[in-house]
């Protein structure tokens, strides 16, 4: 609100939403060709025990550093959940090490997220829609690829891959480009990731931690 009152652009550094595969996904969602989303699944599981910032009592934990990417992708596809439940492993000083999160939506759609800072699994995100299935290749939160397929057991598939040579965290450059364009337009928030989305995701994460503490 302060940035808005000053006429300044404020954006969260949720760079995954500005990657090419996310732009393609957004276009598919807006077209309506996929139908309504049914079931979303994503996992961000990497043995990050050597990354000290994750395990500090101030700002530590896997949810805010890693899990936010799964939640932001779920939000892009499904919106904000109406029900939240979680379970997991809590380590020293009450810092979450691993979480399994289930989200329910008023539409009837479901999302299941797996986040771990102690185990490693492929970092993929997929969603079943009424008319198709969509998969974001690992690691889904950096420049990668997107596959759209039929819902058959052996689906017909079409894949787009980022061939720019931009890899890993170099993908931050995509959001920087969008940011520069928004500044030139005089915007105060991102149309593809508005402030209300940022705040909503933070609230969901707080509820996840509350749910975890009571299980």
Regions found by a protein language model. Give the residues of each.
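Short, well-ordered coil/turn segments that N-cap beta-strands
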Residues: 7-9, 36, 107-109
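Beta-strand-loop-alpha-helix segment that lines the small-molecule cofactor/substrate pocket
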Residues: 1-14
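Predominantly a Rossmann-like dinucleotide-binding segment in NAD(P)-dependent oxidoreductases
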Residues: 16-85, 92, 215
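Alpha-helical elements of Rossmann-like donor-binding domains used by nucleotide-donor carbohydrate transfer enzymes
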Residues: 20, 24-27, 73, 100, ...
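C-terminal helix-rich "cap/oligomerization" subdomain common to oxidoreductases
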Residues: 106, 178-215
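Short glycine/proline- and charge-enriched loop/turn segments
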Residues: 52-59, 154-162
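Active-site loop of classical SDR/Rossmann-like NAD(P)-dependent oxidoreductases
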Residues: 163-177, 193
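Contiguous beta-strand/loop segments that form the cofactor/metal-binding neighborhood of enzyme cores
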Residues: 72-145, 171-173, 177-187
């Amino acid at each position: 609100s302060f940035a808005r009152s000053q006429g300044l652009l404020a954006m969260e550094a949720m760079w995954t939403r500005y990657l090419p595969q996310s732009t393609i996904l957004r276009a598919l969602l807006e077209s309506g060709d996929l139908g309504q989303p049914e079931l979303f699944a994503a996992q961000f599981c990497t043995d990050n025990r050597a990354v000290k910032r994750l395990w500090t009592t101030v700002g530590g934990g896997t949810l805010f550093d890693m899990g936010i990417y799964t939640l932001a992708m779920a939000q892009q596809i499904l919106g904000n959940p109406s029900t939240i439940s979680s379970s997991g492993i809590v380590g020293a000083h009450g810092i979450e090490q691993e979480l399994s999160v289930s989200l329910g939506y008023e539409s009837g759609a479901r999302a299941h997220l797996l986040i771990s800072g102690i185990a490693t699994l492929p970092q993929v995100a997929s969603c079943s829609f009424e008319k198709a299935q969509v998969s974001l290749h690992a690691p889904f939160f950096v420049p990668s690829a997107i596959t759209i397929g039929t819902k058959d057991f052996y689906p017909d598939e079409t894949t787009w891959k980022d061939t720019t040579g931009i890899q890993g965290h170099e993908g931050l450059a995509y959001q920087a480009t969008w940011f520069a364009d928004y500044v030139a337009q005089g915007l105060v928030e991102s149309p593809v990731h508005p402030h209300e989305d940022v705040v909503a995701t933070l609230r969901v994460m707080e509820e996840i931690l509350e749910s975890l503490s009571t299980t």
